[in-house]
Amino acid sequence: IPVVNKRITVSPIGTVCAGYSRDQMVKVCKLLDDCATDAGVDFLGGFGALVEKGITPGERNLIDALPEALATTNHVCSSINVGRTRTGINMDAVKLMGHRVLDVAAATADRDGLGCCKLVVFCNIPEDVPFMAGGYLGVGEADAVISVGVSGPGVVKKAIDRAVRRRGEQVSITEIAEII
């Protein structure tokens, strides 16, 4: 199965950089982007916050930094968790993220709103997410963890290629659906 994207995640930056200003959060995002480039990975996740029960000043600064941060970086992805079944939905966070999603889209309009492809707003985010764009290293994880994920598109492509080799070019759409 081909490796489609190489990804790394960090602990939620809203927690790690809790005392940072908006401008400092943008600088952190750019630093993370440089690290992703140096590491040779396609995506770096973790520029995010867990705000389901309230928003700290640092988390608010991170959220306010999202438009500039995602518009000026290539590899960094962000996830914001706004609710949990047990604790409810932080409606202030939902409202704030509604505005920030629009701001990110506007900030990356020259690239077809690409920033929004690097931003996920969750409810019930898992404790650790290795998949982009919502990836982050869970706070209960060890300092170095390897998660191996199977790429859905890579698996599908490999299965279709195998069927075409076996049956020739005459693979029907029904057969492809069955393979998938």
Regions found by a protein language model. Give the residues of each.
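Anaerobic metallocofactor- and corrinoid-dependent redox/one-carbon enzyme cores
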Residues: 1-180
